[in-house]
Amino acid sequence: MTTTLSGPDQQAQTLTIAEDIHVRASLEATFASLITQLGRQNETPDGKPLPMILEPRPGGRWYRDLGGDNGHLWGLVQSIKRPVLLEIWGPLFISTGAISNLMYRLSEVDGGTQIAFKHSLVGPVPDEFQQNMAPGWEAIHARVKRAAEAARPE
């Protein structure tokens, strides 16, 4: 995984996180796992449930529903092309005015599926987020891989 942070101060930062994940499962199973793990099966890196709602369609919301019309909007589906592309745009988990773009590109490779992930962020990024973002994405991607590989037919 690579992480690049640039900008003279916290107000003008850009952050890019990239990761390639090889999954021993079909494109369809991997894409389905991605949607599920970003949605209702989402967890914190330490394994605590953090269920989200992901509406997998253009303009669909990705949010945390706290009940009673309360919650947190993390982003909107900018592009989706099943089973090879999911792109989300929004503030994600940062309430500082920063904006993010997440891109998942899936391709069929020998022995399964390759996921090319890229998180691009522009805006103020508090130090604790800089340190925890890459491990957070790695934890989600490990769950996507595990679930997709467990679901594949023998």
Locate each region found by the language model.
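Hydrophobic ligand-binding cavity/cleft-lining segments
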Residues: 1-50
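A conserved amphipathic terminal alpha-helix motif
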Residues: 2, 121-154
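Structured surface interface patches that mediate subunit assembly and partner/cofactor docking
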Residues: 13, 43-49, 53-54, 138-143, ...
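A short small-residue
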Residues: 14-16, 117-124
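Conserved beta-strand segments that form the floor/walls of ligand-binding pockets within enzyme
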Residues: 16, 22, 87, 105, ...
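Hydrophobic pocket/interface hotspot
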Residues: 30-34, 62, 77, 88, ...
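Residues at helix-coil transition
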Residues: 35-39, 82, 142, 146-149
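Hydrophobic-ligand binding "helix-grip"
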Residues: 52-53, 58, 63, 67-110, ...
